Amino acid sequence: MTDIKSMTERQLADFFKNMGQPAFRAKQVFTWLHRGVRSFDEMTDLSKPLRAQLAETCFITAPTVARKQTSKLDGTVKYLWELADGNCIETVLMQYHHGNTVCISSQVGCRMGCAFCASTIAGKVRDLRPSELLDQVLFTQLDSGMPVSNIVLMGIGEPLDNMDNVLRFLELVNSPHGMNIGMRHISLSTCGVVPGIDALADRQLQLTLSVSLHAPDSETRSRIMPVNRAYDVETLFAACHRYFQKTGRRISFEYAMIDGVNDHDWQAELIAKKLKGMPGHVNLIPLNDVVESPYKPSRRIGAFQQKLESLGVTATVRRSLGGDIDASCGQLRRKEMQERGQL
């Protein structure tokens, strides 16, 4: 069976050509799929024989809501979607003055092993298909009734560990006959998969790259982020400099503030040193408590921010949304897995 929603318009055109169908079928079906139909029978401008033929050879992905939490504080909505194979993924809808942002997952689970993150506790199960990435944006918009204007790939999983499917998703969601979300309204976060950063630079995509740094020295970073053993801090920053030189786009560096681990003044000084010659924005993140993690939130966020700014580094503190729900990455999925006896 063919995952028809993972096809681009060009691929659909070839698909229908091979079926002996006219070229305009591609746009028809593409448009229906990106409206969120769950079956071919809903495609009422196709003949019944064609709909039956498609149903025999193709399937349409469509997740169901396993859990849903809405914050009474700020309206943030956390979705736990159940996929066709029973696996669950998380999506978060956040409301800002500049529009609605959806934070999506790129994998079922994660194999990166960051010590302070709930997403990686059960490891990686599988990659998400392009259609399953798209569905998170599409069905969040349909369920909430709120138009989505921005996407961040910062949910469960490492996007650059699922590179081909993520690139296909970007093409799909950017299509003028689909959701038509511009690349400049999309952010992609990586824990530092250097070959993926170089591949993105070569493609000259106009998205915003965010790098989960969390420590500027390899000793600390290797302790909390195993990926650093494959691509150490020096290798990572070299790739970031190459990315800026090729794209001209500023990188955002995510920095979860961990008490006594990465919140020292000398680490702020090291960040400033490594950013020299490259514009960068450091986004300081108040750490979320994870039951299985020994790490605690830093009490020096304000002081660390002031130190960075005194060194000429642009630094902001991320606004925490959904504080009264399981809005941080991996928490709701973990709760579901515990209740299913999978943890």
Model features per residue range: what roles?
Residues 139-318:
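Conserved AdoMet/S-adenosylmethionine-binding subsite of the radical SAM
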Residues 71, 105-106, 119, 189, ...:
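Short linear Ser/Thr-Pro motifs
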Residues 95-132:
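Canonical Radical SAM [4Fe-4S] cluster-binding loop centered on the CxxxCxxC motif
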Residues 1-89, 241-250, 255-343:
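Auxiliary Fe-S-binding modules of radical SAM enzymes
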Residues 77, 89, 100-104, 112, ...:
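Generic beta-strand structural signal
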Residues 85-99:
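P-loop NTP-binding catalytic core
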